[in-house]
Amino acid sequence: MGLAGAQERAGRPLAAEFLPEVEEVLAERGEPPYRLRQVYAALAGSLASGWDEVASLPKGLREELAGRVPASVLELRRISRARDGTRKYLFFTRDGHAIETVMIPERSRRTVCISTQVGCPMACTFCATGLLGIKRNLKAREIAEQVFAVARDIAPERVTNVVVMGMGEPFLNYRETLRALRVLNDRRGFNLAARHIAVSTSGLVDKIRRFADEPEQFHLAISLHTPFEEERRRLMPVAARHPIPELMNAARYYVERTRRKLFFEYTLLAGVNDRMRHAEALAELLDHPLYHLNLLRFNWTDTGFSATSARRAKEFLRRARELGLSATLRPSRGQDIEAACGQLAARDARSPTAR
C-alpha cells in the first residue's frame, strides 16, 4: 500500500505518528503542515542523521529542533564483521538499553534483520535472546532507524530486504512494529517494497489473524520447531497458550486471506527434533501448497542444545521433500560474531566502542 496503510487507516498522517515530538515543535511555532513532510522525507527518505543535514528547513527551525528533538534516537556503538561478510550492529537507545541488528549480504541482496524489543519475553529454550527476559518495547523510530543506520553504513549498496527476526516478539509490540514497517514501505519514506519485508512470530494466533487482514503485502514466518504438541511446549512456552491445532487454523486463515506463501521456521536440534518421524509429521501438518518449511541448523548458544550434523540436516531435508514438502535448508551466517539466528543477546554491550 503506497500511502502507508491508508495514512494509518485514515487516522493521523504517518509522518505525525512516526515523529510526534517534531510535530509538537512545529505546531508550537505555527509552521505550515508541509514542514513535517519535509522532516519526514529527510530522516526516513534521505537518511539524514543530523539536523544540519536537513537543508530544506530554515536555519532557525533546524537550530530549535536540534535543541529539543534528537535527529536520531539510536546511538551506533559498535559494528562487528564476520568472515562471511555479515555485520552485527550494537545500538544503544537514549535510555541506555542495548539492542542488536544484523546485515546479511547474499549475492545481489542485502538483508537487514531488525529487533522490536529490548530482550524477549517468550523464553524459547534454545534462544539466547530469550535468556535476557524483557526490558521494554521499542518505539517505531527505534525499529526503523536500525535500517536507516545500516543503509548509511553500506552505501552506495542498498538495503534490499528487511526481516523482523532479531530481538523480541514483534507481535507483542504490534502497533509500533507495523508503524515502523509502514515507514520502511512508504514511498515518501524508505520506499522498500512490502514484498521485501518479512515478520517472524513465535505463534501469537490472534495477531496472525490480524496481520492477515492488514492491507500491505508483508510476508509472515511462524516459528514452529516441532510438529509435536508436548515437545513444542517444552521448547516454546508460548505453545501452552496457542496449541498447534489453533496455530494451524490461524495459518490456514492467513494463506486463504492473503494468497501469499507462509513460511515455517524450524531450528534443527541434535537428538531433539531432527528425526525422520519429525519430517514425516511435518509433511502431514504442512499440507498446503502455500506452506514452505525453512530449516536451519542450531547456532550455538549456552542453552544446553547442540546442532544437528550437516549430514543429518541434509537427510532431513531430503526426506521432507520426498514427502512432498516445499522446504529449504538455510545456511547459518555470522556465527563467529554471534550474529546468527537465536544468538542475539548484546553480550558485547560493555565492550569498548569499535568500528
From Swiss-Prot:
Required cofactor names: [4Fe-4S] cluster
Enzyme Commission designation: 2.1.1.192
InterPro entries, alphabetized: Aldolase_TIM, Methyltransferase_A, RNA_MTrfase_RlmN, rRNA_lsu_MTrfase_RlmN/Cfr, rSAM
Database matches in PROSITE patterns: RADICAL_SAM
Subcellular location: Cytoplasm
Intrachain S-S bonds: C113-C341
Gene: rlmN
Domain Radical SAM core: start-end pairs: 106-326
Protein's name in the database: Probable dual-specificity RNA methyltransferase RlmN
Keywords, sorted A to Z: 4Fe-4S, Cytoplasm, Disulfide bond, Iron, Iron-sulfur, Metal-binding, Methyltransferase, rRNA processing, S-adenosyl-L-methionine, Transferase, tRNA processing
Cofactor: how and how many bound: Binds 1 [4Fe-4S] cluster. The cluster is coordinated with 3 cysteines and an exchangeable S-adenosyl-L-methionine.
Family: Belongs to the radical SAM superfamily. RlmN family.
Organism, scientific name: Rubrobacter xylanophilus (strain DSM 9941 / JCM 11954 / NBRC 16129 / PRD-1)
